[in-house]
Amino acid sequence: MHPTDTRDPQYYHRVVDCQWACPAHTNVPEYIRLIADGKYTESYMLNRESNVFPGILGRTCDRPCEPACRRTRIEDEPVAICRLKRVAADLRGDIDHLLPKAAAEKNGKRVALIGAGPASLTVANDLVPLGYHCTIFEALPKPGGLMRTNIPSFRLPVEVLEEEMDMILDMGVEVHYNHRIDSMK
């Protein structure tokens, strides 16, 4: 079996319905293949290419991919795509050497981000390796935004939340906690 070629979005829209339904267009068929082969770390890292919080989303995503799953054409239930994402996150090995690193040379550009929620953390994850200095201003004493304040810990354990956020913050993101921004002036 060969990996699905997803370079042409029109192709995978017609053929890989689950991937098209995913807002992040995560390569669902490939990460499931990797899990089937027992390659949990590789599956996690593939997920992380399109979504920097696979362990969090494996517990909290509303799973738009599953109603689109082609398996329902022949069986009653779709593939448990979201649960498989969680399996990869929970069973992965050490990934420190695979995570993005801060650029050795800074480009001299600074980016201010308001709120230490998933959007700002994702921006920092993408820009710090490109040499940007990212500073986050967070009104609360801890990062996470609504992930921390509105998702109960029985659904999203604090350890999972903090581990995935730390993967980004540990790249050298500057964070000012208890610093509410009331105006852009």
What is the meaning of each model-derived region?
Residues 1-110:
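Ferredoxin-type iron-sulfur electron-transfer modules and their immediate structural context
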Residues 25-36, 42-48, 77-82, 114-182:
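Beta1-alpha1 glycine-rich phosphate/pyrophosphate-binding loop at the start
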Residues 87-105, 163-184:
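Glycine-rich dinucleotide-binding loop and its adjacent helix/turn
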